């Protein structure tokens, strides 16, 4: 059986920074929704005990990234929590990368989440999604939302999740060919880091906003120009800390019309938001229970 799995992108429909911990982690309130677009991972388990990652060109990746880290963490947890011998837990992982790096679409976090969920099944370690989500915080704060796989209000540093249902819409995702480091953007002093935490029902009724957008627009003139252009036709803002911008539409035809107006030096992709992650859908289609 071919084990090819979705590693979907997300957008932050709103993102507020509500505080900062003594260790540098930021408290947030954000609304995550998944897209029917993203990377794919082909994961082939073996008993050699090694984790190997290959790119689209079948080149072996020699640097440690979120995928390798996730696989190694799962092996370690299985050893310490279950007393399982994990020396034979291995896999070849082939990454088909479509989500741009530094785009705010969550590619690295999504890759780690797909790795954890799929290897948990293939290695039969049988951890719950909640246990995987807690483990994933050792890698990154966005990963629990990808593991749980629902449209979600995210609070705390990413560990507090409130699943909600939201109307699925069409989006034009615009990548300005700029890669933005989340770590670097969080370090900028002028970003508002004390937005008052608000009740969820109030947030959902209010106009959505991203606390990073003003700083990003000042720092990157091209992003500011694209937001201004797209906002003439549809609600538009950055996702995450950028660089991608999304414009929201009620139908695909409207998104296609605005896509045709984009400058030639930017990439545009038309996608649809989904309330259930494509990764979870893939498990349902294979009749595999994620909630053991």
Curated annotation (Swiss-Prot):
Active-site residues, as the UniProt record annotates them: 10, 142
Domain of life assignment: Bacteria
Keywords carried by this UniProt record: ATP-binding, Isoprene biosynthesis, Kinase, Nucleotide-binding, Transferase
Gene3D superfamilies given in the database record: 3.30.230.10, GHMP kinase, C-terminal domain
GO molecular-function terms, A-Z: 4-(cytidine 5'-diphospho)-2-C-methyl-D-erythritol kinase activity; ATP binding
GO BP: isopentenyl diphosphate biosynthetic process, methylerythritol 4-phosphate pathway; terpenoid biosynthetic process
One Pfam family matching this protein: GHMP_kinases_C
Pathway assigned to this chain's UniProt record: Isoprenoid biosynthesis; isopentenyl diphosphate biosynthesis via DXP pathway; isopentenyl diphosphate from 1-deoxy-D-xylulose 5-phosphate: step 3/6
Stretches that traverse the bilayer: none
Reaction(s) catalysed by this chain's protein: 4-CDP-2-C-methyl-D-erythritol + ATP = 4-CDP-2-C-methyl-D-erythritol 2-phosphate + ADP + H(+)
UniProt: ATP binding residues: 100-110
NCBIfam families noted in UniProt: ispE (TIGR00154)
Assembly mode: Homodimer.
Annotated family: Belongs to the GHMP kinase family. IspE subfamily.
Task of the protein: Catalyzes the phosphorylation of the position 2 hydroxy group of 4-diphosphocytidyl-2C-methyl-D-erythritol.
Protein name: 4-diphosphocytidyl-2-C-methyl-D-erythritol kinase
Organism: Buchnera aphidicola subsp. Schizaphis graminum (strain Sg)
């Amino acid at each position: 059986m071919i084990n090819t799995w979705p590693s979907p992108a997300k957008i932050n429909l709103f993102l507020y920074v509500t505080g900062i911990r003594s260790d540098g982690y930021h408290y947030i309130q954000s609304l995550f929704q998944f897209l029917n677009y993203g990377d794919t991972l082909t994961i082939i388990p073996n008993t050699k005990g090694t984790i190997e990652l290959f790119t689209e060109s079948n080149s072996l990746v020699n640097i440690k990234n979120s995928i390798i880290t996730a696989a190694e963490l799962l092996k370690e947890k299985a050893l310490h929590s279950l007393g399982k011998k994990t020396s034979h837990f291995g896999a070849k992982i082939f990454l088909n990368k479509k989500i741009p790096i530094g785009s705010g679409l969550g590619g690295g976090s999504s890759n780690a989440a797909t790795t954890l969920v799929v290897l948990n099944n293939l290695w039969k370690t049988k951890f719950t999604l909640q246990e995987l989500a807690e483990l994933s915080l050792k890698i990154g704060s966005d990963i629990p939302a990808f593991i749980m796989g629902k449209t979600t209000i995210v609070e705390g540093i990413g560990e507090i999740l409130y699943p909600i249902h939201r109307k699925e819409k069409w989006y034009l995702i615009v990548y300005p060919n700029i890669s933005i480091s989340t770590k670097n953007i969080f370090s900028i002093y002028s970003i508002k880091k004390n937005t008052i935490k608000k009740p969820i029902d109030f947030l959902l009724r209010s106009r959505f906003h991203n606390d990073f957008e003003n700083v990003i627009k000042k720092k990157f003139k091209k992003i500011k120009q694209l937001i201004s252009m797209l906002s003439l036709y549809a609600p538009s803002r950055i996702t995450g800390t950028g660089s991608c911008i999304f414009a929201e539409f009620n139908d695909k035809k409207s998104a296609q019309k605005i896509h045709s107006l984009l400058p030639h030096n930017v990439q545009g992709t038309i996608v649809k938001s989904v309330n259930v992650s494509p990764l979870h859908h893939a498990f349902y289609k294979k009749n595999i229970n994620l909630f053991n």
